[in-house]
């Protein structure tokens, strides 16, 4: 490294490695003027002025036209170049409405740099085009036209002016939409610590050490804590907002992305509080607290510490100042969680500081009036949300050479903006058959470009920003409209809630109806199955200790397997179930299978005790099963009742042809059924229908299509018809015949008690 030395003393007077980053007013003057001696008086020179008498004449001679300097200069030729007008004749006349001017209307900028522009009111259609295409836009437009032309020979190329118009409308509508949408603030500790310095965590300030707020991120710092020599007039920005306002940066020593940042000598970012808290590093520029150095001197053991708050192995941690505590945490995490820490500076420039910090167990209980209890859950929630942004390869190693960034997420354009752009273009009579598809493709390109720019806007026009300020956000009409929309949404929500509840009730009733149908089918077609299941459950309940749960070698299959076979319809008779239970009563077989005498004794006693009781259960089951009215197929006979509650005979065709209730009858069967119905007495008929209608049904027979059905026929359906008025035309009996052969007029009490009950049930079912 080059240095300068005095020839007399040999002392270094200029060291670039130390003075390159120092302000000029702080560098010693001898570094610039090493021979200047301020203690010695200056020498005064006296002499005759005659030796300077010809100086003025020589200067005049130098400036004369005969000077050899002017003769040596080349003669410059000035050529007047006529300005070339902008070629605007090829612009579509419809596109000129968006602010494009012809060559005759071009206004050349005057010599002055001040121009007063009137702020136009907010308008969605009257606006000039403020977007200019760049190289990327031109390349995409060329590729898009070539791609469309390859698939469609009649394709009309999209002009550059059209693309500028569409991108301007999209950008305006997107900015207006963002202005209307409410901002969602993240979980921030600064709301709890409003007005405190983010470095020393103190709110007290003095005239020479005031708290300064950043005009962009609102970060509050002391002058001495952040190296601010004086409070500037006007706006002040922190180092992060001044050097990288649109970038997402991370600290090299912690995962926190908020706070006061400074730079390192190797070009990275870190928090000022992190540089103060870590004892191995220091500031190269102590006056501005910037340029952190000696990062390589941090031991590896500090890089391997895991923070007890964010649970991330990222950067370097500090440890609790208690001599018996080894809790490690980032100092920024400690501030978010409300831990106690205090900075002790031995000078005003923070060139030598000491920090005292304590974990949650050793923090004084009266610190910040119990603020730690509120901030600690917020800090854990903040780092849980951010944990997905930290790659795994950085969790198990020391701080990387570069700051990792997660994938930037940009929001896609809503369909509202796409429709809005199309409507604006149609309002200007921009007529193209493929206009919606072109606008959609341009919106996709706009979304990808915003994503590549990390969601930065494409336009930064002051006129557009002024129009955003004039948005009628607080207009009374809009608030009334918002209330109306909210009321309509609330009504729709209530209707939807009612519909969902009704749907849930309907599905519940359907489920109950399905279960009832299943039970009815089981009772009708498997009458013995319910009897077997109930009998088996009673027998299993007798084995309280579960002695016969497991299968045995004598043929016993166990309660679990036996229950599965019964409930899966593999055992269909009482005799089959008795055979399955015979190994339990076989005492000799049980003795041969069990070696444990205590268990064997209990099983034999259970078999001897319950054998008689089980046989009684089987006898009762057989008696009940024999009392059931079954047909020749083993199905339960369901009585057929008329609308008047009286039982009547079924159609004999089913029994004669040995048909099932689910079989489809032929045309001959239907004819026989028709004759049977016509032969019934008027009091026995359920309904009447024209013969022509029945003949048409027989002629066009594909499935059983008979008029409305009700009642039962051999466990299935009987027929019922209605007249034109919608009233059933069934006939009621005029009189009732008693057992002794006498007749009496029909009344409600004319029937026996059981028949009245049957009839009342039938009427209830019919209604």
UniProtKB/Swiss-Prot annotation:
Ranges annotated as C2HC pre-PHD-type zinc finger: 248-281
Compositional bias ranges of the Polar residues kind: 724-752
Q: Which Gene3D superfamilies match?
A: Zinc/RING finger domain, C3HC4 (zinc finger) (3.30.40.10)
Query: Does ATP-binding appear among the keywords?
Result: no
Write down the SMART domains for this protein, in alphabetical order: PHD
Pfam families for this protein: EPL1, PHD_2, zf-HC5HC2H_2
The protein's name in its UniProt record: Mst2 complex subunit nto1
Give the organism, scientific name: Schizosaccharomyces pombe (strain 972 / ATCC 24843) (Fission yeast)
List the gene name.
nto1
